[in-house]
Amino acid sequence: MEYKDTLLMPKTDFPMRGNLPNKEPEWQAKWEEEKLYEKIQEKNAGRKAYILHDGPPYANGELHMGHALNKTIKDIIVRYKSMAGFSSPYVPGWDTHGLPIETAIAKKGVKRKEMSIAEFRKLCAEYAMTQVDGQRTGFKRLGINGDWENPYITLLPEYEAEQIKVFGEMAKKGYIYKGKKPVYWSPSSESALAEAEIEYQDKKSASIFVAFKVTDGKGVLDEGTNIVIWTTTPWTIPANMGITVNPDLDYVVIESAGEKYVVAEALLPSLREKLGFEDATVVKTVRGSELDRVVTKHPFYDRDSLVMNGEHATAEAGTGAVHTAPGHGEDDFLIGKKYDLEVLAPLDDRGVFTEEAPGFEGVFYDTANKMVTEKLEEVGALLKMEFITHSYPHDWRTKKPVIFRATAQWFASIDAFRDDLLAAVKGVNWTPAWGETRLFNMVRDRGDWVISRQRAWGVPLPIFYAENGEAIITDETINHISELFREHGSNVWFERDVKDLLPAGFTHPGSPNGEFTKETDIMDVWFDSGSSHQAVLNARPELSRPADLYMEGSDQYRGWFNSSLTTAVAITGEAPYRNVLSHGFALDGEGRKMSKSLGNTLLPGKVIKQLGADIVRLWVASVDYQADVRVSDEILKQVSEVYRKIRNTMRFLLGNINDFNPTTNAVSYENLREVDKYMLIKLNDLVKNVKDNYEAFEFSTIYHQINNFCTVELSQFYMDFAKDVVYIEAADSHDRRAMQTVFYEAVVTLTKLLAPILPHTTEEVWNSLIGEGVESIHLQDLPEVKVLADSEEITAKWDAFMQIRDNVQKALEFARNEKLIGKSMLAKVTLYVDGEAKTLFDSLEGDFAQLFIVSDFELVEGLENAPESAFKSNQVAVQITVAEGETCERCRVVKKDVGVNPKHPTLCGRCADIVVKHYEA
């Protein structure tokens, strides 16, 4: 007889290697064919809703690791909620208007000026939809479960129609107005930008100190005295209309080389060296308030520059006197308005000077910096010029510097409902908690929102103009345009004449001749995505407003979180979300931003081809995503190793329940051995902890908890000593069926707990466990937390045992290193115990040799009896010796009773009994 044939070795069709790149598409095809998303919605119909509203990614370019991070976090949340008793539909979306798409079309050689706007926009729409299709394929390959056949897309007519309604409602409440004031202007994009479209980068700029000569000192300053200003934008000097000083600061008049100069007293020490005023004497001190309405002369134009009082002039830097150009700065504009100064902005859309700046016509503003500085030097007004590097606003799309430029734009007034916005921020639950402060401060400090853009590809501003120039935004026109867009799309605005866009028979007192014109500007793309609460949440029957969760990158506090809040509070009075969760950015392994120039980009598509989507998803679960996260080949290798451990654990569990039927073979909890109960209690604790952490969106804790359970509780303990039972004992023996009961519970529980994170692998486990044709794991609910008898008492006892077991393992390791034993199965453990440890072992049930995975065990009372060579800890001493007896051919345990049955001379008594009873014919 071959004794190896009597061993009950693991059998499973669940392979050791995942082969994820090839297997995952098969599962995805099956899910699509079986309409799994729809089945999940049907299963959860009638349950409490949990709505995660997808912030739309921009439909341009290949998916990057930031996309993978974002969509996977969302998918984990939605899958968890769908298995936790909620109805949680997921409607993905795309943001499809804006400059990057115009630029992409231009790069293809399309000449925008050589075709109608409507034709150009059609090309933009076609391009955007191809990008949507490409990204949709990528997201589906990542295992993201959602309504991919019916996403929301901002260029679709039904979306645009609802966006028009949002605009109309805001206009109706008086929140929309047209005004001329400085806005961020991008010469590279030839358009106004909102704050959300600005990013700061270091820029080298000329820093100049300029003298303005007093022509009317109002009895405070002598004529010819120089007021000194400092600026890092020399090109704005042609637009200078005044100088601002702080009314509450002290200013000194100093005399140097026969000239008088005025600077803030607090800044004089730093300016003495910088401007060569080392020998200057202070002639007099005046309060800033005394300088109000002093008149100076522009350095090279024949006009006055008025001295004004303003709080924004400080003694933190410069001279305390601020060069003021109302056409090129927000503070400048506001104080200029107060003092009734002209708003001069002598630049065109491309940033080129017009004839309003004599001497600089046709010059690009940045080039003009040098010319202006030279002109100031020529007229003797330049006191100092140097270069500094400072943080400067740039166009987030073109990466080129932006300027402040006063132009006529359409605005949404934030002041009109700022208090409501701030109250709404306070009413939302923010994770991380600092998100509340961040958005609150942004809303508190932000100016009005410039919503018009001078571009072609976007939703038109639905505004008509009467003959007298009056803007027309009425319920009648808004509803008509909304329905026109719903039926024909927004291109109709550019395809039809004004008369065909207005409601039939429309009249207006400002147009006695019945003539009208239409606005040519489009809306800021943030108004597009910011309207999704109306166009998606409110419009779709399966969704609702407010959403339970908005979850995006931390850059969206200034973006989508902000624009969505603004439009929602404006039209509904409340935030569009109950909870907001934000994540950091995906960086390379060294914590650097990924970029083509650094050659450190890692694309999810490539990783999925090499390792599989479940590895990318496990990486997402492993990181503390609320901060910036790192990803590299090395990090993914570490994640793959954890995946391998989880997979091997599943394979072992599946392999050892191949002859187990949970209906007929399971052992009830009360009939289990204590060590088996202990494992079920630990498993139950895991269920509670994992569910709590899913609820708190703490996925990295789940990753560590499950990895720890698989590695420590199962692999290093329970599964390890179980081999001596499940391989060796008779198939139907109580102890074997008890352990299989635990194995079955463990594999079912782990599979369900991991399903939101590893959808493909858990489906594979589930099919192997339950059989082909089974209902998907994703249609199951998460395991419930059970109340298990005596759990506290059993846990306390066995946790204490596990600590002692750790000491035994260390002693065995030491003995192996010292060559006292080979494998631990050749060892005998003698344990010397006192006090609590003695009481513990007296109360424990179990085969301790088996639990320690050695051949023999002896318990001796009294630590003092331990030999010097024993491995000692505070409670026990461990002596390792070679076990006496012979190795049983079947179970490989060293036993003194090997050969007790002469028919089976190489077997121990236990194995001989099993063979005789179950395997001899």
Curated annotation (Swiss-Prot):
HAMAP family: Ile_tRNA_synth_type1 (MF_02002). It comes from Listeria monocytogenes serotype 4b (strain CLIP80459). InterPro entries: aa-tRNA-synth_I_CS, aa-tRNA-synth_Ia, Anticodon_Ile_BEm, Ile-tRNA-ligase, Ile-tRNA-ligase_type1, Ile-tRNA_ligase, M/V/L/I-tRNA-synth_anticd-bd, Rossmann-like_a/b/a_fold. The lineage of its organism: Bacteria, Bacillati, Bacillota, Bacilli, Bacillales. Belongs to the class-I aminoacyl-tRNA synthetase family. IleS type 1 subfamily. GO terms for cellular component: cytosol. ATP binds at K596. A motif ('HIGH' region) lies at residues 57-67. It is found in: Cytoplasm. It catalyses: tRNA(Ile) + L-isoleucine + ATP = L-isoleucyl-tRNA(Ile) + AMP + diphosphate. Its main location: cytoplasm. Zn(2+) binds at C888, C891, C908, C911. This is Isoleucine--tRNA ligase. One of its GO terms (biological process) is isoleucyl-tRNA aminoacylation. Coiled coil: none annotated. Binds 1 zinc ion per subunit. It is an enzyme of class 6 (ligase). Catalyzes the attachment of isoleucine to tRNA(Ile). As IleRS can inadvertently accommodate and process structurally similar amino acids such as valine, to avoid such errors it has two additional distinct tRNA(Ile)-dependent editing activities. One activity is designated as 'pretransfer' editing and involves the hydrolysis of activated Val-AMP. The other activity is designated 'posttransfer' editing and involves deacylation of mischarged Val-tRNA(Ile). A motif ('KMSKS' region) lies at residues 593-597. Monomer. Keywords: Aminoacyl-tRNA synthetase, ATP-binding, Cytoplasm, Ligase, Metal-binding, Nucleotide-binding, Protein biosynthesis, Zinc. Pfam families: Anticodon_1, tRNA-synt_1, zf-FPG_IleRS.
